[in-house]
Amino acid sequence: MEASGSAGNDRVRNLQSEVEGVKNIMTQNVERILARGENLDHLRNKTEDLEATSEHFKTTSQKVARKFWWKNVKMIVIICVIVLIILILIILFATGTIPT
């Protein structure tokens, strides 16, 4: 009778050990899920910050591009005016309208 009682106790201890192991695994899984949720929140915040920063960068870069485009246009206009003045002077000197 003791052998069957001892075997029953061993079986109960084995089951309790298995239950404890499953409990530990489930606790670890819950901790991992909570950590993952925190990481996702952190990632979401970083994504929102990056989106705001990218919008600011986009508008700033467009303003800078527009500014330099106008600078180039002004420079081209100035060069064209200078070339035109030189051509007019050359033509006037060549035709004798302006005496040398």
UniProtKB/Swiss-Prot annotation:
Residues the UniProt record annotates as site (Binding to STX8): R32
GO cellular component: azurophil granule membrane; basal part of cell; basolateral part of cell; basolateral plasma membrane; cell surface; cytoplasm; cytosol; early endosome membrane
Pfam families: Synaptobrevin (PF00957)
Lineage, opening ranks: Eukaryota, Metazoa, Chordata, Craniata, Vertebrata
Membrane topology term: Single-pass type IV membrane protein
Tissues with expression: Expressed (at protein level) at a high level in kidney, lung and spleen; at a lower level in testis, liver, brain and heart. Expressed in kidney and retinal pigment epithelium derived cell line.
PANTHER family membership: SYNAPTOBREVIN FAMILY MEMBER
Record-stated family: Belongs to the synaptobrevin family.
Cytoplasmic side: 1-74
Function statement: SNAREs, soluble N-ethylmaleimide-sensitive factor-attachment protein receptors, are essential proteins for fusion of cellular membranes. SNAREs localized on opposing membranes assemble to form a trans-SNARE complex, an extended, parallel four alpha-helical bundle that drives membrane fusion. VAMP8 is a SNARE involved in autophagy through the direct control of autophagosome membrane fusion with the lysososome membrane via its interaction with the STX17-SNAP29 binary t-SNARE complex. Also required for dense-granule secretion in platelets.
SUPFAM superfamilies hit by this protein: SNARE fusion complex
Gene: Vamp8
Keyword Coiled coil set for record: yes
Protein name per Swiss-Prot or TrEMBL: Vesicle-associated membrane protein 8
Transmembrane segments: 75-95
Primary subcellular site in the record, as a coarse category: membrane
